Design a protein with these regions (language model features):
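Phosphate/NTP-binding elements of NTP-utilizing enzymes
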Residues: 1-447
Length: 447
């Protein structure tokens, strides 16, 4: 039984099977506070909110620090071991990374909502980090799944806790990587609470590189003679986050602790994601030891616009096909979460997807009623596009329920009726499981 343990408590609880990967969660604690019976971020105490840096904290009275140290310790504990809460009367575990995302990562709409699909994503990602055979995740995503923000949050979460490490970002173009860096990564860092924020060099909102290290200051006679213990003990992490232009050799020869690969299914010629992964994979290892991980996620472009190479990479990351060293062909582990798990408007106030049409309406996260299940809604949309082969094909591509849907090609690229071809492929796939077909070596009777 090939189980990856993500528990940091020394005890194992439930074992999840996510797309073929068995993952052992920690055991639930004896007492979990019920609270609101759903996820709500905790209010950041206003006495701490006004503290901007660790230096300001040091200047406070010991009595103030003693009062707030248990709160700060608890935050570090949750970051390291994950967090349990009660959600709709169910004991629910989220990883430390997921907790940091929900509680401390400011995104475009404020703090993110809790979603069950993201919980499963983070549990899978935690297993990728814990498994010494794995180089990271190859995530085939749906539109608006929040991956870019989640990856940005993980970059800051890891970088603020790592010394002497490098973090890199790639996207479908250099401009896209820069936008992710300036619009997502940097704001999350700025809004972190002081106790998670290391000393930063350079501008508050850097455009090129975010460096957690001590700014170089000129040594003067006065600074050398200073007896201020904080100045003497001043040590930065010497950790940097940056991005590179898209190219087959981006990050060649560098050592990375985390490589975020956003929009990897959209690398258009002459850039080739397969070639780049061949290069960047070596940034994550020393000899045969894996020292860094890749967080890769994308929807798939049309096959001749980068989709075909991404499909090959995804298929060579299948957990069920390992070599004798226990690794997949690419070294990554593939994950696909179908659209019905994460479709806006069909997620209830507990963050759970509403698959089937409910008998009485269910309350959404903002108090809005959900009266139709996501599957019925999806089928209704497909039904309405029956006469429009391009529209129907695009519906499957944009809102995929299977990897086959996600990797469909755009119809305008084909001389043939792709919808009919895909229908036949789906039909043939179904036949395999019906017992109508029998596979084997046949010999003629009386022949």
């Amino acid at each position: 039984s090939d189980v990856v343990v993500i528990s940091r408590t020394g005890q194992i609880g439930e074992i999840y099977n996510i797309q073929g990967l068995k993952i052992a969660l920690p055991k639930a604690p004896k007492k979990i506070i019920k609270g609101d019976n759903l996820w709500k971020p905790e209010e950041y105490p206003k006495e701490l909110k006004r503290i901007q840096s660790i230096f300001e904290w040091k200047d406070y009275l010991d009595s103030f620090k003693e009062r707030w140290e248990p709160y700060i310790d608890e935050q570090f504990e949750r970051r390291e071991k994950g967090h349990w809460f009660i959600n709709n009367n169910i004991e629910t575990y989220i990883t430390g990374t997921h907790y940091m995302y929900l509680q401390w990562s400011k995104i475009d709409v404020g703090l993110p909502d809790f979603r069950e699909s993201n919980r499963l994503f983070y549990i899978f990602w935690e297993a990728c980090k814990a498994d010494p055979r794995c180089y990271g995740i190859c995530y085939l995503k749906n539109r608006r799944s929040g991956f870019s923000f989640m990856a940005s949050g993980e970059t800051i979460n890891q970088a603020t806790a790592s010394s002497d490490a490098r973090f890199g970002i790639l996207s479908k173009s250099g401009a896209d990587a820069k936008k992710m860096f300036t619009d997502k990564v940097v704001p999350i860092s700025i809004n972190y609470p002081f106790f998670f924020k290391p000393i930063q060099d350079g501008m508050d909102r850097p455009k090129q590189e975010l460096a957690y290290r001590v700014p170089a200051s000129r040594l003067t006679r006065r600074s050398i003679q200073s007896t201020d213990p904080y100045k003497i003990a001043l040590e930065g992490l010497d950790t940097t986050i940056d991005y590179k232009n898209t190219g087959d050799n981006s990050y060649d020869g560098e050592k990375l602790k985390l490589l975020v690969h956003d929009e990897s299914g959209k690398w258009e010629r002459p850039n080739n994601i397969l070639n780049n992964w061949g290069v960047t994979k070596t940034c994550l290892r020393l000899g045969s030891r894996i020292i860094g991980k890749c967080m890769m996620g994308s929807t798939s472009n049309a096959l001749d616009k980068g989709g075909s190479n991404f499909k090959k990479l995804y298929q060579s990351s299948d957990i069920n096909k390992r070599n004798k060293n226990g690794q997949t062909k690419s070294g990554l582990y593939s994950l696909f979460i179908p659209m019905e798990w994460n479709y806006e408007g069909f997620i209830d106030k507990y963050g759970m997807p509403v698959f089937d049409t409910p008998k009485i309406s269910i309350e959404g996260p903002y108090g809005d009623p959900i009266e139709v299940g996501v599957l019925e809604h999806w089928h209704n949309e497909a039904e309405g596009l029956k006469g429009d082969q391009d529209g129907l094909n695009e519906h499957y591509r944009q809102f995929p329920r299977t990897t086959e849907h996600a990797f469909r090609d755009e119809t305008q690229n084909s001389l043939y009726n792709l919808v009919k071809i895909y229908e036949q492929i789906d039909y043939n796939e179904d036949l395999k499981h019906t017992g109508v077909l029998t596979q084997g070596s046949f010999s003629w009777e009386n022949g």
